[in-house]
Amino acid sequence: MINDVVILVGGSGTRLGSITKYTPKPLLKINNISFLDQLICKLIKYKFKKIYLMCSYKKDKFFKKYHKIFIHRTKIICIDEGKAMGTGGALFKIRNKIKNNF
């Protein structure tokens, strides 16, 4: 069974232009609920133990809202990517925390 989920939320959303100037793309709202909240709600139904958010751009917003909170026994952990290095860099940084293949 897969216990951990990794969500890459570090992109700066440059293709969205001014829309993401103050709000990171995953925190943009669709029907008054952020995309990330919608995704987390769907993942919680599958009873994962941990959700890792790989943060870079405007990381303080993710840490403030999500870091080390529990939702129905699922722990959300924010990881600071440091300098954004793309998908490979984010996954390389978290490689020692993930117990399962994914």
Give short role names for the model-derived ranges:
Residues S18-K21:
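Conserved catalytic-core motifs of eukaryotic protein kinase domains, centered on the activation segment
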Residues G11:
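Active-site glycine-centered loops adjacent to acidic/histidine catalytic or metal-binding residues
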